[in-house]
Amino acid sequence: MAASSSLDHLSNRMKLEWHSKLNTEMVPAKNFRRTSIICTIGPKTNSVEKINALRRAGLNVVRMNFSHGSYEYHQSVIDHAREAEKQQAGRPVAIALDTKGPEIRTGNTVGDKDIPIKAGHEMNISTDEQYATASDDQNMYVDYKNITKVISAGKLIYVDDGILSFEVLEVVDDKTLRVRCLNNGNISSRKGVNLPGTDVDLPALSEKDISDLKFGVKNKVDMVFASFIRRGSDIRHIREVLGEEGREIQIIAKIENQQGVNNFDEILEETDGVMVARGDLGIEIPAPKVFIAQKMMIAKCNIKGKPVICATQMLESMTYNPRPTRAEVSDVANAVLDGADCVMLSGETAKGNYPCEAVTMMSETCLLAEVAIPHFNVFDELRNLAPRPTDTVESIAMAAVSASLELNAGAIVVLTTSGNTARMISKYRPVCPIIMVSRNPAATRYSHLYRGVWPFYFPEKKPDFNVKIWQEDVDRRLKWGINHGLKLGIINKGDNIVCVQGWRGGMGHTNTVRVVPAEENLGLSE
């Protein structure tokens, strides 16, 4: 116990010492941002020119929100993103499909008119179809048939993101709840319904979601942001729908309710990554507790080595204003300090008046926040928390990051097929960039999910291997990755470069770490 306390004290002292040396005149390297930026593409940004402008500002991942828009519209986003990628060859752009998810909604009001009600007003919430198009101030329809089975007296019901709140007084029968309104507001048509603190049995996917996922598979999207994930089995169901053709699509579980928070460990086991979706989560649980949930989920993802995205209202005021609030900038920086791999913009880039300015502001904020991270402390903590015995890939990842820190290396160059080795190196948060070289174009795109990874697609065909040709191919790829780093200015000539590779051709062989100088050739002729 005493030893543990001593270590904790040393760690805290080092962290405080690191922070005490920060100053506002620091200028981070603008050409190396570790945190990826996800941008929602909407009417204001759906063109090749706009997407290229967002890329120059810092975009890494294009997000399509399937709560809105037709297939024709989303197809145009995909086509524009792919064309933009071609115009900056070698720098992949990932495409994400964000599902609408299963939801509960009210019915239509009489005449589709808003119906005012006051705090204290008592009425019924009903699943009876006779009110589906005739809701009024006495009977409001909701389309969740099992609501009377899962909810109980004393529970809350929020309508329209909590603008209208009800307390359940009584479960009258299998179709009817007696409720009391808690605030003044309007009953309106087709508004979303939340049941905070109530476990619901909605399916993981609606029929629309299934159709949308098939559209995504057909168009070879790189990742799915799966809305309203409540349990680990939801992820398994999504994998079944994606099928063999969609096996490389990364599934990112959006945690948006108390059930998802309660079942987070089992979800984390199944998913490829997590999104802390703070909008709906802040409705389902008390807003001050979202801060705790964010810290917990990001920490568990970091320990597990799975990517985590922080999202919702990060620079919301920049939708209509050229500058963010100080609180918003602090929110972005805090997410980076917490350990988020990616941060996301929604309305700011989808419909905002200042999309490029928002991305630039987010990029600059991430760069400065990354300077404040005590990387040696983070590495030691993650290494101490790694389960023992570790597997080969994780051991090599730890060794590579340790070497990079001790050598003050300019970069870690990793050769990979699936991107898994790059993910594990990213887990241990090196200071230097991770230059990933892969012949797998899908892996180069979805590796934008991993903090610090700069993915490059290696276009040369894989040769028929013997030992000599294999080693030449390895050196060629390493040289190719180093040269790209030199051209982009993320490494400098003469830097020590930590290289991670297989020790021989084929799958399943132990990886090797070696150190080479950053030169234009590694003993190979051009």
Curated annotation (Swiss-Prot):
Gene Ontology annotations of biological process type: glycolytic process
Pathway(s): Carbohydrate degradation; glycolysis; pyruvate from D-glyceraldehyde 3-phosphate: step 5/5
Chain positions recorded as ATP binding sites: 65-68, 105, 191
Modified residues (Phosphoserine): 36
Residues involved in K(+) binding: 65, 67, 98-99
Annotated SUPFAM superfamilies: Phosphoenolpyruvate/pyruvate domain, PK beta-barrel domain-like, PK C-terminal domain-like
Molecular functions (GO terms): ATP binding; kinase activity; magnesium ion binding; potassium ion binding; pyruvate kinase activity
Annotated control of activity: Regulated by phosphoenolpyruvate substrate and allosteric effectors such as fructose 1,6 diphosphate and magnesium.
Coiled-coil segments: none
Entry binding sites for Mg(2+): 256, 280
Catalytic activity: pyruvate + ATP = phosphoenolpyruvate + ADP + H(+)
GO cellular-component term (any): cytoplasm
InterPro entries: Pyr_Knase, Pyrv/PenolPyrv_kinase-like_dom, Pyrv_kinase-like_dom_sf, Pyrv_Knase-like_insert_dom_sf, Pyrv_Knase_AS, Pyrv_Knase_brl, Pyrv_Knase_C, Pyrv_Knase_C_sf
NCBIfam families reported in the protein's UniProt record: PRK05826.1 (NF004491), PRK06354.1 (NF004978), pyruv_kin (TIGR01064)
Assembly and binders: Homotetramer.
Protein family: Belongs to the pyruvate kinase family.
Stated name of the protein: Pyruvate kinase
Lineage: Eukaryota, Fungi, Dikarya, Ascomycota, Pezizomycotina
